[in-house]
Amino acid sequence: MASLKFTKMEGIGNDYVYIDSTRNDIRLTPEQIQKISDRNFGIGSDGVIFIRNSKQGDFMMDMYNSDGSSSEMCGNGIRCVAKYIYDHGLTSSKNPKIETGAGILEVDLKIGSGNKVDLVSVDMGKPVLVPSQIPVVWKNEETIIDQPLEIGDKNLKFTAVSMGNPHCVIFVDDSDEFPVRGIGPLIERHSIFPKRVNVEFVTIRGKDHLYQRTWERGAGETLACGTGACAVMVAGNLTRRSGKDVQIDLRGGTLRIQWQESGNILMTGPAREIFSGEIEI
């Protein structure tokens, strides 16, 4: 067995195991990722993120869900990657460019006490609304806004958005009372979503103030989802439920999401290092 160094980090409760692969090209099997992510027999996390060198950006974020499947992007994860590379001296730049499965993203680091990163803003790019590019198997290529979706005995309405990964946003009266763990997996694997989908169940709390629960593709319900929060803001604006500068509460904390004049989405939130260690794999 080999010993693997790691750092566990979280962004508003969305926790991943981070592995610095900038010096050695570390690769793990899906089974090893499942073992590491297991909350009873491993470190416990929503997945594993490798920090790698990049030919296109300053660094690369290589992300895997807790079931071992790969994922294009994680908004909370990229904030933690940004904090790691600065706090651990891999870069002195406060605006590094990070390569993801959703493209190159630029981050803006807010430095706090002890010269450590407190907050991170990420330019998440433009939302994708064309069904075939999300992807959603749909009757045409028109934007899917508040369209009917029948799941069991529930007649829901959904808005489809990609923020580099697919999202299905559903507004409900009370997210806390909604059966997320029952309905979430049924929507995740619905036949209209060929690559599966992340599902957000959203309640309006006030003007430009939303509350979100997330069923993540490949991970189940998580305390937070950054790309999901971006998709929620887009869906809220498209359905005239909210504006373009929104506070979104999640079970793990709060994010500020802004739809800028450029058309890009800006996400701002915290990132925190929990502990580091070694694990036998």
Swiss-Prot record:
Q: How does it assemble?
A: Homodimer.
Residues annotated as site: Could be important to modulate the pK values of the two catalytic cysteine residues = H167, E216
UniProt-recorded Gene Ontology molecular function terms: diaminopimelate epimerase activity
Q: Might you name a Gene Ontology BP term for this protein? A: lysine biosynthetic process via diaminopimelate
Cellular component terms per the entry's GO annotation: cytosol
Provide the binding site for substrate: N14, N65, G75, N76, N165, N198, E216, R217, G226, T227
Report the active site residues: C74, C225
Give the chief site where it resides: cytoplasm
Named in its record, the pathway it takes part in is:
Amino-acid biosynthesis; L-lysine biosynthesis via DAP pathway; DL-2,6-diaminopimelate from LL-2,6-diaminopimelate: step 1/1
Query: Is the Cytoplasm keyword given for this protein?
Result: yes
The record's comment on protein family reads: Belongs to the diaminopimelate epimerase family.
Family annotation (HAMAP family): DAP_epimerase
Cellular compartment(s): Cytoplasm
Domain of life where this protein originates: Bacteria
Q: Which InterPro entries match?
A: DAP_epimerase_AS, DAP_epimerase_DapF
Record's keyword terms, sorted: Amino-acid biosynthesis, Cytoplasm, Isomerase, Lysine biosynthesis
The organism named in the record is Leptospira interrogans serogroup Icterohaemorrhagiae serovar Lai (strain 56601)
* Enzyme Commission number, as recorded: 5.1.1.7
Q: What is this protein called?
A: Diaminopimelate epimerase
The free-text function statement in the UniProt record for this protein reads: Catalyzes the stereoinversion of LL-2,6-diaminopimelate (L,L-DAP) to meso-diaminopimelate (meso-DAP), a precursor of L-lysine and an essential component of the bacterial peptidoglycan.
Q: Does the keyword Transcription apply?
A: no
Q: Which reaction does it catalyse?
A: (2S,6S)-2,6-diaminopimelate = meso-2,6-diaminopimelate
